[in-house]
Amino acid sequence: MAKTLYEKLFDAHVVYEAAGETPILYINRHLIHEVTSPQAFDGLRVAGRQVRQIGKTFGTMDHSISTQVRDVNKLEGQAKIQVLELAKNCEANGISLFDMQTKEQGIVHVMGPEQGLTLPGMTIVCGDSHTATHGAFGALAFGIGTSEVEHVLATQTLKQARAKSMKVEVRGKVNPGITAKDIVLAIIGKTTMAGGTGHVVEFCGEAIRNLSMEGRMTVCNMAIEFGAKAGLVAPDETTFAYLKDRPHAPKGKDWDDAVEYWTTLKSDDDAVFDSVVVLEAKDIAPQVTWGTNPGQVIGIDQVVPNPQEMADPVTKASAEKALAYIGLDANTDMKNIPVDQVFIGSCTNSRIEDLRAAAAVMKGRKKADNVKRVLVVPGSGLVKEQAEKEGLDKIFIEAGAEWRNPGCSMCLGMNDDRLGEWERCASTSNRNFEGRQGRNGRTHLVSPAMAAAAAMFGKFVDIRHVELN
């Protein structure tokens, strides 16, 4: 029987299944951070249980840490408690931890692939909704709750119902200036923020195949933003080249054997998907969100939609509420919207490719006077090291940006990088919900190049018309 890639991955990891019961999956890799793991370890202690397979779990610090200092003792309140608890729990259980004293530390979804912890064919979980990022490698990766974190620590398994399969095909080549972020925002704009609900999505087509691994991670990262359980890209030579010689990747004959297996990880030609979505790559323009969910997005060359022209009453009401919060009028030209802050970072867009794209725009330019702050936050210590080796940090600083240490930073209002009330931000992150970047902050999701251009020109501009250096 023909199978989709998702079905192959799921079936390969079922350790127990009975009629009328939810299947139990084996979990190959468990990634943890400081926010969703403390209660899980407390649960283990209360129950008198131990971590079942120590070598399958890896931790890092990212969500609540400061990107300005690397000293745990200078953290305050809940952030300090969370970070110290993670360190204590990892030490007590023999779990490998990339803490703030190591250059390998970083955002969990940047660190995992860098270290070769993310491999094709794996099941990967983390107490974080953007775990779908790792699906870019042909791994079944999804976010779990804290009680499930405890369950995986104790058993290395997880109850998981089968999802439906969706294929999203992006046909042809994108035009110059169009990035992975634009592709995935265009997908979400077409499907809406709930279009993938109940599905695991496989991204395919020439435009997806042409992406680097960094780009594929950006696409899979945002699968959750249109309701999908996970996102997948079948592994290929691009995948293998990225993973070769990574610290935790197989070596020697084990590598050869692994690649032989990984090449089988693809949907069968006659596999049947429950849903199919098709986009033409040539039609995708640089994307900017105008509302308060990632599905409220349009091309930079368009105007803010008019709710009065929306036939569906629910869509209309949602748009009216979003525009009231975001402070925009219908029919406003997207190129006439000024910004107060710019954030380049997050698990969506903080890899070296993203920083290079931003630097190409910012080189030789200065931050616009109306832009109060530009934060550039690398996704890991290794990304930071590489960027500094290439001199990107100097480009950012000379342009008027702040060059920070790795962490989740302004993606979410959980640390000391936040928007002021009613400030408008061009952000490379993944969510533009109300208050996501700080109380009453207004977030517009864009690509790194678009964010950098907004910083330099003080408003959203069409990156296709900006000279790159």
Swiss-Prot record:
Cofactors (names): [4Fe-4S] cluster
EC number(s) reported in the record: 4.2.1.33
Pathway: Amino-acid biosynthesis; L-leucine biosynthesis; L-leucine from 3-methyl-2-oxobutanoate: step 2/4
GO biological process annotation, one example: L-leucine biosynthetic process
GO MF annotation list: 3-isopropylmalate dehydratase activity; 4 iron, 4 sulfur cluster binding; metal ion binding
Residues binding [4Fe-4S] cluster, per UniProt: 347, 408, 411
PROSITE patterns: ACONITASE_1 (PS00450), ACONITASE_2 (PS01244)
Catalytic activity: (2R,3S)-3-isopropylmalate = (2S)-2-isopropylmalate
UniProtKB keywords: 4Fe-4S, Amino-acid biosynthesis, Branched-chain amino acid biosynthesis, Iron, Iron-sulfur, Leucine biosynthesis, Lyase, Metal-binding
Enzyme class: lyase
InterPro entries according to UniProt: 3-IsopropMal_deHydase_lsu (IPR004430), Acnase/IPM_dHydase_lsu_aba_1/3 (IPR015931), Acoase/IPM_deHydtase_lsu_aba (IPR001030), Aconitase_4Fe-4S_BS (IPR018136), Aconitase_4Fe-4S_dom (IPR036008), IPM_dehydratase_rel_enz (IPR050067), IPMI_cat (IPR033941)
Keyword Iron found: yes
Origin: domain of life: Bacteria
Manner of cofactor binding, per the entry note: Binds 1 [4Fe-4S] cluster per subunit.
Task performed by this protein: Catalyzes the isomerization between 2-isopropylmalate and 3-isopropylmalate, via the formation of 2-isopropylmaleate.
PANTHER family named in the record: 3-ISOPROPYLMALATE DEHYDRATASE, HOMOACONITASE, MITOCHONDRIAL-RELATED
Subunit-level organization: Heterodimer of LeuC and LeuD.
HAMAP family: LeuC_type1
Family the UniProt entry places it in: Belongs to the aconitase/IPM isomerase family. LeuC type 1 subfamily.
Record-linked NCBIfam families: leuC, PRK05478.1, PRK12466.1
Protein name: 3-isopropylmalate dehydratase large subunit
Gene for this chain: leuC
